[in-house]
Amino acid sequence: MNQTYGRLVSRASIAATAMASALLLIKIFAWWYTGSVSILAALVDSLVDIAASLTNLLVVRYSLQPADDEHTFGHGKAESLAALAQSMFISGSALFLFLTSIQNLIKPTPMNDPGVGIGVTVIALICTIILVTFQRWVVRKTQSQAVRADMLHYQSDVMMNGAILIALGLSWYGWHRADALFALGIGIYILYSALRMGYEAVQSLLDRALPDAERQEIIDIVTSWPGVSGAHDLRTRQSGPTRFIQIHLEMEDNLPLVQAHFVADQVEQAILQRFPGSDVIIHQDPCSVVPREGRKFELV
């Protein structure tokens, strides 16, 4: 699984870096030629894209290193750090756009040949949609937080390029402040995306539990297993591609230790079959030592 995960995540990061680099060169020319503040916004965003995608590429390779004596749970948290770094990069670009947009609202500057800007923006829009489609597929296969953060960023780029097209079209017909107004709106949306991305990264670093749906699946697997009378103290978290799952099984007092161990192994394999690559720890408790009021997920 780790090899497939690493290959897909690395390809997604390389594709994002290559596309952002190519679009940056095109946008530099378009901004120089037209003077559009909206295209300047897209140019700054491409710079952030490159920095973020390169960070992802380096961090993902580090996060895939096996556990060692100093990092016994692996290096998966590096992905969350990459997502947090991305949110900082994006926030900085959003603040830059605010200042530039306000300046152009106060003193609007007519553009030279908006048609060139429109052509460049259409190319950027098509390329970004293709990249986001590929990233969404990688996220569905790997659940990589770093690629998900990158995907959210490029999804905002799709909306941004659409807004730029409208702004350039309005400017073509003489409404020069439209360029700055749309750039300001883009900056607000980019800042919102950055804050949301940073929040998710911090939650992962704080070991937030797995989603409710996944925890419910674990509970259903455990409590429906023959020989298991109930369960409690389910604890979950995720680090990179690895889910960490801990749970206590409640079993009949007279069940032999060997049989209890066998049942726990079966439950562990069932969980691993549903969530491959997970780190599962199961503890067996006799029913009599678990206070009834302290039980959770008890079978009725």
Swiss-Prot record:
Record organism: Salmonella choleraesuis (strain SC-B67)
Known partners and oligomeric status: Homodimer.
Protein name: Cation-efflux pump FieF
Sorted UniProt keywords: Cell inner membrane, Cell membrane, Ion transport, Iron, Iron transport, Membrane, Metal-binding, Transmembrane, Transmembrane helix, Transport, Zinc, Zinc transport
Gene Ontology cellular-component terms listed: plasma membrane
Xref: Gene3D superfamilies: Cation efflux protein transmembrane domain, Cation efflux protein, cytoplasmic domain
Catalytic reactions of this protein: Zn(2+)(in) + H(+)(out) = Zn(2+)(out) + H(+)(in); Cd(2+)(in) + H(+)(out) = Cd(2+)(out) + H(+)(in); Fe(2+)(in) + H(+)(out) = Fe(2+)(out) + H(+)(in)
PANTHER family: CATION-EFFLUX PUMP FIEF, MITOCHONDRIAL METAL TRANSPORTER 1-RELATED
Cellular compartments annotated: Cell inner membrane
Transmembrane annotation, as ranges: 24-44, 82-102, 114-134, 156-176, 178-198
Molecular function GO labels: cadmium ion transmembrane transporter activity; ferrous iron transmembrane transporter activity; metal ion binding; zinc efflux antiporter activity
Family: Belongs to the cation diffusion facilitator (CDF) transporter (TC 2.A.4) family. FieF subfamily.
Cited InterPro entries: Cation_efflux (IPR002524), Cation_efflux_CTD (IPR027470), Cation_efflux_CTD_sf (IPR036837), Cation_efflux_FieF (IPR023783), Cation_efflux_TMD_sf (IPR027469), CDF_Transporter (IPR050291)
Functional description taken from the UniProt entry: Divalent metal cation transporter which exports Zn(2+), Cd(2+) and possibly Fe(2+). May be involved in zinc and iron detoxification by efflux.
A biological-process GO annotation: intracellular zinc ion homeostasis
UniProt binding sites for Zn(2+): 45, 49, 153, 157
Topological relation to the membrane, as annotated: Multi-pass membrane protein
